[in-house]
Amino acid sequence: MIPDDEFIKNPSVPGPTAMEVRCLIMCLAEPGKNDVAVDVGCGTGGVTLELAGRVRRVYAIDRNPEAISTTEMNLQRHGLGDNVTLMEGDAPEALCKIPDIDIAVVGGSGGELQEILRIIKDKLKPGGRIIVTAILLETKFEAMECLRDLGFDVNITELNIARGRALDRGTMMVSRNPVALIYTGVSHENKD
């Protein structure tokens, strides 16, 4: 895992996704060297970079041009990116342009989560995995309900991370925002 402080950051771009969250995302995604993955709402590229070192192809999508630029700089900084396609634009339109996928990570949806998940379902190969990260309660509920409506078994895990900070008299644990991972695998419905 790439430590958080090794990412180039941009004040107008969220991220990077905390290292501990990226670690669990990779465990749930089970990336394989022949997999094709998409990172929707790539931000600074934390998840994109982790996937890039583990899969055949990554499509990184963000509507914010500064996010795409920051992700590109982070890929270059870490010697990754030969297998990454950066796509600036709205996720539903961009998703329609990519091939079928094995892994989908949705870290930002711009209010279009249901449409994004419907398109991902149509693009998901048999045995594919979907992981949605959420900090808002409404997003957690929306993701769970939408994935269930699409025929998936849905799981949710919430991470409450605290990191130690040295003080004169000891170490204080400093909490970060809780992050939920809503995840699933194979759909109950047959893909036509």
Swiss-Prot record:
Gene Ontology molecular function terms on file: cobalt-precorrin-6B C5-methyltransferase activity; protein methyltransferase activity
EC number: 2.1.1.196
Reaction(s) catalysed by this chain's protein: Co-precorrin-6B + S-adenosyl-L-methionine = Co-precorrin-7 + S-adenosyl-L-homocysteine + CO2
Swiss-Prot/TrEMBL GO biological process terms: anaerobic cobalamin biosynthetic process; methylation
Residues that hold S-adenosyl-L-methionine according to the record: T17, G41, C42, G43, T44, G45, D62, A91
Keyword Cytoplasm annotated: no
This protein's pathway: Cofactor biosynthesis; adenosylcobalamin biosynthesis; cob(II)yrinate a,c-diamide from sirohydrochlorin (anaerobic route): step 8/10
Pfam families: Methyltransf_31 (PF13847)
Enzyme class: transferase
Keyword vocabulary terms for this entry: Cobalamin biosynthesis, Methyltransferase, S-adenosyl-L-methionine, Transferase
Alphabetical list of SUPFAM superfamilies matching this protein: S-adenosyl-L-methionine-dependent methyltransferases
Entries under InterPro entries matching the protein: CbiT (IPR023475), Cbl_synth_MTase_CbiT (IPR014008), Cobalamin_biosynth_MTase (IPR050714), Methyltranfer_dom (IPR025714), SAM-dependent_MTases_sf (IPR029063)
Self-association state and partner proteins as the record states: Homotetramer.
Matches recorded under NCBIfam families: CbiT
Family label: Belongs to the methyltransferase superfamily. Archaeal-type CbiT family.
Record protein name field: Probable cobalt-precorrin-6B C(15)-methyltransferase (decarboxylating)
Species name: Methanothermobacter thermautotrophicus (strain ATCC 29096 / DSM 1053 / JCM 10044 / NBRC 100330 / Delta H)
Taxonomic path: Archaea, Methanobacteriati, Methanobacteriota, Methanomada group, Methanobacteria
